[in-house]
Amino acid sequence: MTALCPCQSGLDYADCCEPFHSFKTCPQTAEQLMRSRYCAYVLKNIDYVIQTTVPGQQAQLDKTLLQDWANDTSWTGLQIVRHQPAVSKIHSKVEFNAFFKVNDEKQTHNENSLFVKIDGRWYFVDSTVELPNQKHPCLCGSGKKFKHCCGAYL
């Protein structure tokens, strides 16, 4: 018997997020990446969460803090509110609600996440860590100024 994927796609984990988590393949859409990141939090796979954050931000992420949060959180559901697959040629947005419990208290996290495609691979742009100055090069490596690239969508 196989287990359903925690991302609530309705597919078995082995046919859904597991190939992403094991880097056998990459998500083809920002929604797939967002679902796989949610699933990674459920499974406490913080390395995947970090590796799927835009490379320019990975060093700023506090792995211990993320791991502690994952350990203290019981994820109870995911709802995709909206997927905007083509905000630009390389950007996409996904709005979602993630339902969870901390200390038996039910909570909801709503987020409108930005994703960027670099060399054919989707990454999450984390707006909770320090972002470049608007006049500096974009953290995605596009060569554009931040304000004319990822910054325009945050």
Curated annotation (Swiss-Prot):
NCBIfam families: PRK00183.1 (NF001213), PRK01617.1 (NF002449), PRK01752.1 (NF002486). It comes from the Bacteria. Belongs to the UPF0225 family. It comes from Actinobacillus succinogenes (strain ATCC 55618 / DSM 22257 / CCUG 43843 / 130Z). SUPFAM superfamilies: NTF2-like, Sec-C motif. This is UPF0225 protein Asuc_0343.
